[in-house]
Regions:
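Mid-domain Rossmann-like dinucleotide-binding core that forms the NAD(H)/NADP(H) cofactor-binding site
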Residues: 144-186
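Structured surface patches comprising rigid loops and adjacent beta-strands/short helices at the edges
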Residues: 128-136
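Short, Lys/Arg- and Gly-enriched loop/turn segments at beta-strand edges
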Residues: 103-111
Length: 186
């Protein structure tokens, strides 16, 4: 376990004020868990990717309920800077991204819990995640490239996971990240 001097973070939380012309987010300073929970890691966020969904949630247009005043965004890439005492899969310096649906880790679970909707998102300078809810990133991607992986990759996989062997898939618009992942996975 590494001890870190980071005890607080800056994060962008929704105001949940949907009046036209009012701010939709506010920058807040808030405490981080100290010590880090035993199975968790502290991540320094290097890049966050914005999706249409993020603007939709901030503007009150999400069709499902969201956590009040939650932190926005579900795609990020960062570096592990501290680990809890029971963490086995990660070390300080690992490049990681959070799993977007934290209740559906293997793809076989039936529950759902989406970052930035059902729980806080990643638009912060530091985030804490259980080690089972993050993935290692390839070293050949820069931080910005890596930050688009979580949602686009999961969306592509979700679209393909129930397609049977010998079935065809039509992929339109090969210029967007989700389309590229579908092409690669299929």
């Amino acid at each position: 376990m590494a001890n870190t001097q980071i005890t607080s973070r800056k994060a962008f939380r929704r105001t949940d004020d949907y009046t036209p012309g009012t701010p939709k987010v506010k920058l807040v300073n808030e405490a981080l868990p100290n010590p880090i929970p035993p199975n968790s890691v502290l991540i320094k966020v290097h890049a966050v990717s914005l999706n249409y969904r993020d603007a939709n949630i901030a503007n009150g247009g999400n069709p499902w309920p969201v956590t009040p005043n939650g932190i926005l965004c579900n795609d990020a890439a960062g570096e592990v800077i501290a680990i809890g005492e029971r963490v086995k899969s990660f070390v300080i310096g690992d490049r990681v991204a959070p799993i977007v649906d934290t209740a559906n880790i293997t793809g076989r679970e039936t529950g759902r819990s989406w970052l930035a909707a059902d729980e806080d998102g990643v638009l912060a300078d530091y985030i804490v995640f259980d080690e089972e809810k993050i993935s290692k990133l390839s070293p050949h991607l820069d931080w910005i490239e890596a930050s688009i992986l979580p949602c686009a990759g999961v969306t592509a996989w979700s679209a393909l996971k129930d397609i049977g062997i010998g079935k065809s898939v039509l992929i339109q618009g090969l210029c967007l990240p989700v389309h590229e992942y579908v092409r690669i996975l299929y």
